[in-house]
A protein has these predicted regions:
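Conserved class I S-adenosyl-L-methionine
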Residues: 1-40, 53-57, 77, 85, 140-163, ...
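A short acidic, Gly/Pro-enriched loop at the edge of an enzyme's catalytic core
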Residues: 98-109
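Short alpha-helix
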Residues: 168-182
Length: 259
């Protein structure tokens, strides 16, 4: 099975629960819209959009938005919710972030949320986003930020146990390196997002035996055993941890640069 097939299989299972799970995080989406500061004239693309959480939230503030995703079931849920909310400037495209079906310099604004840790080769979709973004346009990436190096392997291992489509969480430095050549960063900030362990595993329908292993690892960490890289803690007798989300907003350079 190819990695893209693994992604489709994983998110097909998540489609019906995805929006409900992320409704508890609407304040973060609201903050994102504020930071994007759209003018209302942007032709916009959301890449690896899932159920188009950002696209639906951003639609009232841009000229139009296209939501592209690899998984048909996720887009179908996005279409249903857009219709339910009477959003009429949103469009949906089944497609691969590694080969965007658009001409160069097609969009004024591009956004992708929680996608890069599912890409097998993150540089490829990044270059594609850079290609189809207009000079002077904004690229917005909101994704998880890797924990410090000694703990990254353990952290990614548990992420992959929970969701086989997970590849690797990138560090701030790795994101900065991708932006370095063709963008000027306007925003670079991180936020801690609390996560309930049970809800997190429920979203991906993690098998019972795998859940039990993850719970055991988290409990062991809480009580002084081997670190998981998640820094889990108890809150009202529930296991919690904080994901660090990194928001980067870059403006594509107006100067052409030699390769």
């Amino acid at each position: 099975m190819s990695h893209n097939d693994t992604v489709r299989q994983s998110f097909k299972k998540q489609a019906g629960k995805f929006t409900v799970y992320h409704m508890s995080k609407t304040e973060y989406t609201d903050y994102l819209i504020q930071k994007v500061a759209a003018t209302g004239e942007e032709h916009t693309l959301e890449v690896a959009a899932g159920t188009c959480i950002c696209g639906r939230a951003l639609a009232p503030f841009v000229k139009d938005i296209t939501c592209l995703d690899l998984t048909e079931e996720m887009l179908s849920e996005g279409k249903r919710l857009a219709k339910e909310n009477q959003i009429d400037n949103i469009y949906f495209q089944l497609g691969n972030a590694e080969k965007l079906p658009y001409e160069a310099e097609s969009f004024d604004l591009m956004i992708t949320r929680l996608s890069f840790h599912h890409f097998a080769e993150p540089e490829i979709p990044f270059r594609e986003m850079q290609r189809v973004l207009k000079t002077g346009g904004k690229l917005v990436i909101w994704d998880m930020e890797a924990v410090e190096e000694p703990l990254r392997v353990a952290n990614d291992k548990i992420e992959k146990m929970r969701d086989p489509s997970h590849t690797r969480i990138l560090s701030r430095e790795e994101f900065e390196k991708m932006f370095q050549k063709d963008f000027v960063l306007q925003c670079e900030e991180s936020t801690l997002v609390p996560v309930n362990l049970d809800s997190w595993m429920e979203l991906t329908a993690t098998p019972k035996e795998v859940r039990e292993k993850i719970i055991a690892l988290m409990k062991n960490d809480i009580y002084g055993g081997c670190s998981t890289g998640f820094s889990p803690y108890l809150q009202e007798n529930k296991i919690m941890f904080d994901h660090r989300w990194l928001l980067l907003i870059g403006v594509k350079n107006k100067e052409d640069r030699e390769e």
